[in-house]
From Swiss-Prot:
SUPFAM superfamilies: Ribosomal protein L29 (L29p). Signal peptide: none annotated. This is Large ribosomal subunit protein uL29. Belongs to the universal ribosomal protein uL29 family. Gene3D superfamilies: 1.10.287.310. InterPro entries: Ribosomal_protein_uL29 (IPR050063), Ribosomal_uL29 (IPR001854), Ribosomal_uL29_CS (IPR018254), Ribosomal_uL29_sf (IPR036049). GO terms for cellular component: cytosolic large ribosomal subunit. Transmembrane segments: none annotated. It comes from Rhizobium leguminosarum bv. trifolii (strain WSM2304).
Amino acid sequence: MKASDVRGFTADQLKDELAKLKKEQFNLRFQKATGQLEKSSRINEVRKDIARVKTIARQKAAEVKA
């Protein structure tokens, strides 16, 4: 997921995307613990996607206040 794609989302879409990514992160951690995870790099990708979404949500909130 690119930051430019995320910037086009509304606040509600950002919340939904964040919830979806956190759920995926939980599932990936569970798969890792049980030894079923095939693509371990996906954990880092999801973690960075979560950071992107949170950063852009924070920036949008700051724009509204300013």
